[in-house]
């Protein structure tokens, strides 16, 4: 049996290929960035061909580093930036336009138009999602309506759509047109109950069914690679990036949750085999589906600005020289000195969804110094995470016992301790922190017998560090009450 599993981790700014062993340990990794294209304010594009080129390069580089070949890989999994939309020619494989990235907001007018009849939650019952520029359906529509002749060609079956997972699979396998249910659940076109494209949604968004990939599970052998460097290796797992992190953290039981701390935060909670509708600002989404087993669902809460706030005080404020300095500066004081920083630079995401909120620093006095500001910056991430956890608990009627964490900010011990304190829950950092790629590797490995089952995966997952609450309940409530007061000051600024 081959000794390793490969994972393609295609993100918003870069592409990586990581090789894992049976223990889930990293054997080799290669990474390359790709260009961010900004044709107009609010428009964000990627060159899909460049992403495919970078994917080929990192696969070859990671294998070469350890003198590995295709025969050393039992399977390859794919994880990807979700919602980003590629439309290409069925015969040539050439994209008809750049990929429209999940951050792209050019479809805002179309969102408003659709929301006139039924509001932002018009399709939430079928999809678990509010109307937003975020999701794929309106991005597909924009390409169909703005690139000459593409709509007619799509209706004739000559044009294909896929998110990045589908485009990579198409190229890796010589033409397989598939997507998994986690990615499909972010298009605004899949029905959460049937796990299939919904005719009512296709009609509302004016998307031809002929251009859509077939929806499959997150863990099965889709086909074998035809790319020379990995020829013959089964492609056997696909998960959207945040769902992949949930799998990588082995959150396989209802009520288990992970939070990814990056530029923003993405918190997903496993809610079991039935979709849980949200009345508290969460998204309902597919967590994963392994082979023929029932789909498992999740609630998702996203926070727009967390790590980006540290970057902002570094670059715009000059408070620190490098991002890691924020913890050192924050440790120069024993608390936040009554200062609260609400980073609503472009509004607030979950659970508020207020586009007209703007950033606020509250509680300033002459006593305030740089250390207090640094504390307030870090604590903002923890406070926002608590708000999302509380909303999820209300929606799911499940109490979170432990929060598993990953992402760049989890190296900040001060933040992780404060997160545990303000949640009044243990916070855990895993030994392998590349959880997104690990989740894709787990999904692929399950499909080919490299891993036996989810119990096997849980036995391989291990803890690097656990933080436990140390704060008095009265102090916890006092801090959170002032945070809630500061948040209200950011509302309705515009």
UniProtKB/Swiss-Prot annotation:
> Where do the annotations place glycerol binding?
82-83, 134, 241-242
Q: Which Gene3D superfamilies match?
A: 3.30.420.40
Pathway the protein acts in: Polyol metabolism; glycerol degradation via glycerol kinase pathway; sn-glycerol 3-phosphate from glycerol: step 1/1
Residues holding ATP: 12-14, 263, 307, 311, 408
Q: Which GO terms describe its cellular component?
A: cytosol
Per the UniProt entry, the disulfide pairs are none
Q: How is its activity regulated?
A: Inhibited by fructose 1,6-bisphosphate (FBP).
This protein is called: Glycerol kinase
Going by the entry's taxonomy, the superkingdom of the source organism is recorded as Bacteria
Per UniProt, where does ADP bind?
Answer: 12, 16, 263, 307, 408, 412
Q: Name one GO biological process term.
A: glycerol catabolic process
Q: Per the similarity annotation, which family is this?
A: Belongs to the FGGY kinase family.
The record's listing under InterPro entries reads: ATPase_NBD (IPR043129), Carb_kinase_FGGY (IPR000577), Carb_kinase_FGGY_CS (IPR018483), FGGY_C (IPR018485), FGGY_N (IPR018484), Glycerol_kin (IPR005999)
**Annotated keywords:** ATP-binding, Glycerol metabolism, Kinase, Nucleotide-binding, Transferase
Q: Name one Pfam family in it.
A: FGGY_N
Enzymatic reactions = glycerol + ATP = sn-glycerol 3-phosphate + ADP + H(+)
Q: What is its EC number?
A: 2.7.1.30
Its annotated function is as follows:
Key enzyme in the regulation of glycerol uptake and metabolism. Catalyzes the phosphorylation of glycerol to yield sn-glycerol 3-phosphate.
């Amino acid at each position: 049996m081959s000794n390793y599993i490969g994972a393609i981790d295609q993100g918003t700014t870069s592409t990586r290929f990581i090789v894992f062993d049976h223990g889930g340990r990293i054997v080799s990794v290669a990474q390359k960035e790709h260009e961010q294209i900004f044709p107009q304010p609010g428009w964000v594009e990627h060159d899909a061909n460049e992403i495919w080129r970078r994917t080929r390069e990192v696969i070859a580089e990671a294998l070469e580093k350890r003198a590995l070949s295709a025969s050393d890989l039992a399977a390859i999994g794919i994880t990807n930036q979700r919602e980003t939309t590629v439309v290409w020619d069925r015969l040539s494989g050439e994209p008809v336009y750049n990929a429209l990235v999940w951050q792209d907001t050019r479809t805002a007018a179309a969102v408003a138009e659709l929301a006139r009849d039924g509001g932002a939650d018009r399709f939430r019952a079928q999809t678990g999602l509010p109307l937003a520029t975020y999701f794929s359906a309106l991005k597909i529509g924009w390409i169909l309506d703005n690139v000459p002749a593409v709509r007619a060609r799509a209706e004739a079956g000559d044009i294909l759509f896929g998110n990045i997972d589908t485009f990579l699979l198409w190229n890796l396998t010589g033409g397989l047109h598939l997507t998994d249910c986690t990615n499909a659940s972010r298009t605004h076109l899949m029905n959460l109950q049937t796990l299939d494209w919904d005719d009512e949604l296709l009609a509302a968004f004016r998307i031809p069914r002929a251009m859509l990939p077939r929806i499959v599970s997150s863990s099965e052998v889709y086909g074998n690679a035809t790319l020379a460097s990995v020829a013959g290796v089964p492609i056997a797992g696909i998960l959207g990036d945040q769902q992949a992190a949930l799998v990588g953290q082995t959150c396989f039981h209802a009520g288990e949750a992970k939070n990814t701390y990056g530029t923003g935060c993405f918190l997903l909670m496993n809610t079991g085999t039935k979709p849980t509708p949200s009345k508290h600002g969460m998204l309902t989404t597919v967590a994963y589906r392994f082979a023929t087993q029932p789909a498992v669902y999740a609630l998702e809460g996203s926070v727009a600005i967390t790590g980006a706030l540290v970057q902002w005080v570094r670059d715009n404020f000059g408070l620190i020289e490098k991002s890691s300095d924020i913890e050192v500066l924050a440790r120069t004081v024993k608390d936040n000195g009554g200062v609260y920083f609400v980073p609503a630079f472009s509004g607030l995401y979950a659970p508020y969804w207020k586009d007209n909120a703007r950033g606020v620093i509250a509680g300033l006095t002459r006593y305030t110094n740089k250390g207090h500001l640094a504390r307030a910056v870090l604590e903002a991430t923890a406070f926002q995470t608590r708000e999302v956890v509380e909303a999820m608990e209300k929606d799911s009627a499940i109490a979170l016992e432990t929060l598993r964490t990953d992402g760049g900010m989890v190296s900040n011990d001060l933040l992780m301790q404060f997160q545990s304190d303000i949640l009044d829950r243990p916070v855990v950092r895993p030994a392998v922190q590349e959880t997104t790629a690990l989740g894709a590797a787990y999904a692929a490995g399950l499909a080919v017998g490299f891993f036996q089952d989810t119990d096997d995966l849980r036995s391989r997952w291990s803890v690097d560090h656990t933080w436990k609450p140390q704060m008095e309940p009265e102090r916890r409530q006092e801090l959170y009450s002032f945070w809630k007061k500061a948040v209200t000051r950011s509302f309705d600024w515009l």
